[in-house]
């Protein structure tokens, strides 16, 4: 998927629109929406039109780093081929991207609501990471990070590897530090 296709799809999904509904709003045929979301090269004016139909607008930001919506699409792709290691690497890269930016540029990286990864634990991890890093910079978190579908009542792990220890028996952050980094306890 190209960056533009990810943006169009995420914008449409964030407004809970079908491709047909977006096509009707933009006076395009549904196949044009599908091609644009599928990564086919679309003209800039078509991308602008589709984003506007979903109530979004394309802006330029002074960064080359991927935003949360783009990273979520990468995570979804890696999970679909059962590659949790690469999915985790993408999540870590999102963290690095957010930490590398300051002020409003950091906020821009978390602004657009990502499409679901199709795994609620990963969706919650993305939301939690974005909320944490934006608040760390004194920025408000976007509404999508507080959606009930992106939260769990009890702590969960990403379950990357079956050999990963179960953290449920460790009750405090201090014990976590002891368990994982004895020198820091």
Go through the PLM ranges and name each one.
Residues 64-129:
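Helix-turn-helix/homeodomain-like alpha-helical modules used for DNA recognition
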Residues 9, 34-35, 48:
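Key DNA-contacting residues within the recognition helix of helix-turn-helix
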Residues 27-42:
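Recognition helix of helix-turn-helix/homeodomain-like DNA-binding domains
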Residues 6-21:
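Short basic helix-loop element that most often maps to the first helix and adjoining turn
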Residues 2, 12-14, 41:
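Short amphipathic helical patch at the helix-1/turn junction of helix-turn-helix
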Residues 116-185:
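Charged, low-complexity intrinsically disordered regulatory/assembly segments
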Residues 13, 24, 38, 52:
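Alpha-helical residues within the helix-turn-helix
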Residues 44-61:
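DNA major-groove recognition helix of helix-turn-helix/homeodomain DNA-binding modules
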């Amino acid at each position: 998927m190209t960056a533009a296709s990810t943006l169009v799809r995420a914008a449409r999904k964030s407004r809970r629109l079908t491709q047909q509904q977006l096509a009707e709003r933009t006076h395009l045929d549904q196949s044009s929406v599908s091609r644009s979301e599928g990564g086919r090269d679309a003209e800039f004016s078509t991308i602008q039109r589709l984003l506007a139909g979903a109530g979004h607008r394309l802006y330029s930001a002074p960064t080359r780093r991927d935003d949360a919506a783009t990273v979520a699409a990468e995570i979804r792709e890696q999970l679909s081929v059962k590659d949790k290691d690469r999915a985790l690497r993408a999540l870590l890269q999102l963290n690095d991207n957010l930490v590398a930016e300051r002020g409003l540029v950091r906020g821009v990286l978390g602004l657009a609501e990502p499409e679901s990864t199709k795994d609620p634990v990963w969706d919650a991890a993305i939301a939690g990471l974005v909320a944490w890093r934006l608040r760390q910079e004194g920025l408000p978190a976007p509404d999508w990070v507080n959606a009930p579908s992106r939260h769990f009542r009890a702590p969960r792990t990403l379950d990357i590897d079956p050999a990963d220890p179960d953290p449920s028996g460790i009750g405090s952050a201090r014990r976590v530090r002891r368990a994982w980094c004895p020198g820091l306890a």
